Amino acid sequence: MNPNFLDFEQPIADLQAKIEELRLVGNDNALNISDEISRLQDKSKALTENIFGNLSSWQIAQLARHPKRPYTLDYIGYLFSDFEELHGDRHFADDPAIVGGVARLDGSPVMVIGHQKGREVREKVRRNFGMPRPEGYRKACRLMEMAERFKMPILTFIDTPGAYPGIDAEERGQSEAIAWNLRVMARLKTPIIATVIGEGGSGGALAIGVCDQLNMLQYSTYSVISPEGCASILWKTAEKAPEAAEAMGITAERLKGLGIVDKVIDEPLGGAHRDPASMAESIRGELLAQLKMLQGLEMGELLERRYDRLMSYGAP
């Protein structure tokens, strides 16, 4: 199976294979088969619209983890100019699972911070599969406090299975680092916009997710635990992950309905990985509009709005 397609996309993959086969035949025999190719392309588009119009929560979770899905550094390349990455937490080390630095969005200075997964095996290991250790969160905190000092808005990109649960991370204060970030972000005197671009896993996501405006891409997820983890606890088997995904309400539309997410940003047909440039432009438009709105607020009003937003979560 084509690695760019997930299991539920197999009918689309089969059609695409036929289209490619016809193109090769046409090139070899100089036959005019453009009409047949156009017919199959229309059929593929209609099939894609039908499949993606009826996705389950589990299928959306699979899309959020797609190996070709754009990561933070991809969006930084599309959205920002003059990006200068900053390293280290000034306590222990630098954590490649979180990237951050100063940049310009349409000429205006901003602080950009986000989780970063890897593509190839070596990079996946170096970035710990996007699971930060305490030094990653402390680095993020350092950059956010710097942004406040220099009056720069903060833009975060969330994409992590969760904070790294290893012994070394716990020994260095993983839970304290996350809790400290929540405290600091709740009080920062600068606008904060967070965007979930893939997986939003538990406290590992929330540690850079306290914000004035929360966006989610259409096929991203946000949850307190992975579907597999939830299924292993409730049903004693990860095979119940599809049921767990549905029960937890991990999708953007579901969370928008609960008032947790402010904006769901539509993805290109087939997902962000099908057209990263178009996806980035959609994100750019939302970020610029939201920044304009937030920067128009008095600081006291901004902080009160953030406090009210946080306190509105949960049952009354």
UniProtKB/Swiss-Prot annotation:
Reactions mediated catalytically: N(6)-carboxybiotinyl-L-lysyl-[protein] + acetyl-CoA = N(6)-biotinyl-L-lysyl-[protein] + malonyl-CoA
Molecular-function GO term, any one: ATP binding
Pathway(s) annotated for this protein in UniProt: Lipid metabolism; malonyl-CoA biosynthesis; malonyl-CoA from acetyl-CoA: step 1/1
UniProt keyword Membrane, yes or no: no
EC number: 2.1.3.15
Subcellular location: Cytoplasm
Superkingdom of the source species: Bacteria
Activity modulation notes: Inhibited by pyrrolidine dione antibiotic moiramide B (CPD1); in vivo the effects are not seen unless the efflux MexAB-OprM system is inactive.
Alphabetized InterPro entries for the sequence: Acetyl_CoA_COase_a_su, ClpP/crotonase-like_dom_sf, COA_CT_C
Domain CoA carboxyltransferase C-terminal, chain residue ranges per copy: 39-293
Main location: cytoplasm
NCBIfam families assigned: accA, AccA_sub, PRK05724.1
Similarity annotation: Belongs to the AccA family.
HAMAP family per record: AcetylCoA_CT_alpha
Entry function: Component of the acetyl coenzyme A carboxylase (ACC) complex. First, biotin carboxylase catalyzes the carboxylation of biotin on its carrier protein (BCCP) and then the CO(2) group is transferred by the carboxyltransferase to acetyl-CoA to form malonyl-CoA.
Name of the protein this chain belongs to: Acetyl-coenzyme A carboxylase carboxyl transferase subunit alpha
Species per Swiss-Prot/TrEMBL record: Pseudomonas aeruginosa (strain ATCC 15692 / DSM 22644 / CIP 104116 / JCM 14847 / LMG 12228 / 1C / PRS 101 / PAO1)
Gene symbol of the encoding locus: accA
